Amino acid sequence: MKKLLITMIAIIMAIGLLGGCGKANGSKDTITILYPGDQSERMSEFMKNEFAQRMQKDLGMKVEMVYVPWDQYWEQKDIMLAAQEPIDLYWDGLPDLATMVNKKQASVLNDLIDKYGKDMLKVLPQEQLDGAKINGDIYGIPSAYAPSSAMYQLVCVRQDILEACGMTEIKTAEDLKLFAEKAKEQFPEMKGPADPIFKPLTRYFADEQLTWCANEDAVVYGDTTNKVYDYYETDAFKKVSLYNREMYKEGIYSDDLTTKYNERDSRVQTGLYLWVEGSLGKENEIIDSVKANAPEAVLKSYLLKPEEPRYITATGGEVLCIPQTAPNPEGAMKFINWLYSSQENYLFALYGVEGTDYEIVDGRINKLVPDEFFYEWMFRNQNYQLFAPNVDQAYIDTYQSWDDEAIISNMIGFRFNNEKVKEIEAAIKEVSGKQMAPILYGFVDFDTEYPKALQALKDAGIDEYVAEVQRQMDEFQAAKNK
């Protein structure tokens, strides 16, 4: 509690100082970026020196960063934006864009892109930006432009331990369970999986592609049937829950498992966990952090039921938004445009100073310092992306052709507007978090708890909610197919 209070005070002071400076000079020479995580020592030095000089030279402005720890980011973001703190740019997950728009946290960007974003369109094509459209207007920049089929459906495993257990690959949920059982026996110091991976397991157990499309984990869209479903009433939910229950009863799952992004990633990076949910490239994103605690670690990602089609369901998972109350929205768009305007700028922002922080050897990027700058995963762009020297060429070939045979989902670009069902949505979230999540993760008995949870969900209004999502989905597809 004391640590949280100190952090909040520090954030408020930082925002207050920045806001005071903006009001004092009354100019548009500064942008303030709200950013998740903790600022590394080298990043702090970089921002004050080389980056500050570059921003002044190229854009004639300053860039200020306000870091918020991962476990507080979303709560503090909502508080700051509601209080109209002077934030010009922030990051969030693209699937939540409609919620941010409904909260009036995101500006329409069409005019800003036309005036200040022309350079970025060379590497962020219009169809990428269309993924952030709501009612015809663009409300964010989908900042990660890279292969994305089967997003959140892969499992990133400790390949070194898998092979030490006498196994070579993972294709099924049964393979995962066998791996966990062998590892528990042969590596008792390991703590099991880092999260219950319900999305990869849903791919495995579902009869069709199911994509989450509203109210976090409660509502899914079936690509084959073209229907919206209450996820908790699908056969896949039951099968995932029963599978996870067996994992829990065998002591493979621990009581503290959640699917929260920052928590599960923090776990696996300790080097003491067997796997974590991921998307293409997950192993390369986290390997350095894992190796810091387990130098012998090797990571590899697997797709359960690999013979089944992969779907592209969104234009990436990240989005950059400019608040409606931003003091300098023009500067924020100029900054985004600058970052994507050349590979030189892109590498400078993501990796620092060439020769000091990184070097390029034979077309590969070799980091000379362990510190993070602007997060690579947040701004990843396949036109500029370089791989580390230790990444196998076979992986790069797979990565670059990953989407070649993927199917574009019928729901790509859909954003649910919850205006008519806000109270129902809140009630559903309450039931989902308190009653359905423990069932899904396998922490409680399915047969005993599910009927009670389902009745609570019905009482909350899930049927009316699903009907509203279906209505909007039908309208969206009808408009798209005109």
Task: State where each predicted segment sits.
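Positively charged n-region of N-terminal signal peptides that target proteins for export
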Residues: 1-4
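Extracytoplasmic/secretory soluble proteins
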Residues: 9-13, 17, 21-482
